[in-house]
Amino acid sequence: MTNMNQANHDRPEPEGNPLPWDDIDTAAMPADQVVSALEARLREDIENIGRDETEHDGVKPVEIYDRAYECKVLADSVSPEGARLTTMEVTFPRIILAEMNTHRVFSRNSASSRAIPIKKRIEMVKKHPYVPEYWGKLQKWMAADEQIDRELRQQAKETWLDARDHAVKYAEELAILGIHKQTVSRLLEPFLWQVAIISSTEWDNFFRLRTSPAAQPEMRAIAELMQEAHEISVPNEVKPGEWHLPLVKYEEKQEIPSEDQPWVSAGRCARVSYMKQEDERDWHKDRDLCQNIAKIGHRSPLEHVATPLEDASEWSGNFRGWKQLRKTMPEPSSQT
């Protein structure tokens, strides 16, 4: 990944902090070392860029960098029978969202091009665009195990950012015409970072497939961060009748009635579609939001919240050993 000013010295200096890998010469590295080198630099810079030290049920988030590859454990729980459920908030290039969505054992909600105002989307693309850090050479098969020549990589970066500039230009023109953001935002998606909340009891196959050298570099980068976060996180024991509650802080549990806590948690997971989780919020509004969207059939956020089953091998939806909040209410005829 590169800073916009690096890619073309005629471009204005973007606002915000320089990216942490600007001084790494990826051109001089073998292809199989590029992603590892970038991840190592990101981890080195954790203390310099700061972390959100807020604990959610005793779990401290793993936060790597703002608007770059990032993984944060929001909640990590284990049942008395040993079934583990983990919820993460991850940030990755939107270009791999389709691949991320192929994993059916994941429950997920993510930032929506239909929900986020086009002005904010354009600002994101201008200030912090996604730019590939690995430029694979055209060849047969799915994996590019060799980069293009060093002198061509800078041209590739400049061409990519030229495409970004054109996308912004035409998005702005469509917005002026009064076109809805659900259409205009599509022009910007190749250059966007995607934020998603993912919950699962089954991670091994994902880690095996997506951390492989054959995986697309962008997918491998975020998958390795997710695997590391999963390995170092220590789950809290949750008993039957209690709940796995992403985004509900320990101190909030003293204020929020126990019967409302699952709805508050699910409501906050739903809000990832259009707001940052660190934004100030009112738990009453989160509860009401969740209950309202559930009534009209938008129930995917209710999958992140779950309570242990007595049998750790029993399935509830796509979770094993945990019953999802979604499964506690009858499904409408039309569901999302």
Which residues fall in each region the model found?
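A conserved ligand/cofactor-binding region detector
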Residues: 2-336
